[in-house]
Amino acid sequence: MFVPILAYLLDRLPFGNSLQGISRRQLSNLMLQNNAPSWHEYAIINRKWRRHACTACRWLNAVLPKNSSIFEPGCGSGANLLWLGQQGFQRLYGSDISVGALELGQNLASLLSLPLEVWHDDGLNPAHVPTELDGILSVNWLYHIPGASLGAFLARYRCALKIGGYLACDMVTRHYDRVPGNTWHTKDKNLPEEKRRPSEYTLRLDEPEIRCVACRNGFAVVKSTCFTFSRPQRAVYLLRRVE
């Protein structure tokens, strides 16, 4: 009984989730140098409260040996990979469509003396994916892409993982379907409907659906947790590639 309760609490407490070794001033200076989207500064400063990202990283940290290779499509500034680097991982790779975010990540890695290899690519239709990976991290992007499919994503990246390799991901749950105004962009809620953009949360799945999609694409769900009171409600999953 004690172990599940402890695991539940660790997934939700902010301790140990911050990126160490960089001040707000240093980060602001790097933001100016790289012309990275301002959202990345917020995400790095507030990383410890972004539980869906932190939990996925912590789970990979717990199950993978430190010599493992980890790839994050949609890595942005690489903050998640750099956190893993601060836990002792050395073979860290990422891709993103934002050149400014990638440059920020490279400069952060240099400042923190951490290994990081990143390149410009589309996570849904990648031109280059590493092979024989031990782990893949995918958080905070797939459900923002109109028309994205978790099944297609798993099918595409399964072959990049070793048999027995892990994939940690998050997903917005269908609870958000019941939130008033869920079809509209959250920043447009006070605008007239004709001026509102569609919701930024374009893909929403509950755990039974995740398990079904995972099974169909050669993965088993090892563990999951749902952040019930987050808005939007998100769940995190650790999948393992099976033969």
Residue spans for each PLM region:
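A short glycine-rich, Lys/Arg-flanked "PGG" loop and its adjoining helix->strand segment in the class I
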Residues: 151-163
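Conserved acidic residues
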Residues: 68, 134
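A conserved beta-strand element that flanks and buttresses the S-adenosyl-L-methionine
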Residues: 137
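Helix-capping/helix-break motifs at membrane-protein junctions
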Residues: 146-147
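Class I (Rossmann-like) S-adenosyl-L-methionine-dependent methyltransferase catalytic domain
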Residues: 1-64, 71-116, 120-128, 168-243
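Short catalytic micro-motifs in class I SAM-dependent methyltransferases
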Residues: 140-141
